[in-house]
Amino acid sequence: MVQLWHVVWHPPLGPPQTLPPANPHYPQSTTQPESLSRLNLCKSTCRWSRPRQSRVTLTVP
């Protein structure tokens, strides 16, 4: 499970093609809302996962 969200967290850094089709509302400004969405997801996932690792991943973007 940790690997799953880890893999989902990395794609956002790459091209917008890796982003999920859940940003048709703001395709231009997809980086900001996507980041917020991922941050919220990570926060609830990091709670039972490894908060230390999540912090390192958060500093990547």
From Swiss-Prot:
It comes from the Viruses. Residues 13-34 are annotated as: Disordered. Residues 13-24 have a biased composition (Pro residues). This is Uncharacterized protein 086L. It comes from Frog virus 3 (isolate Goorha) (FV-3).
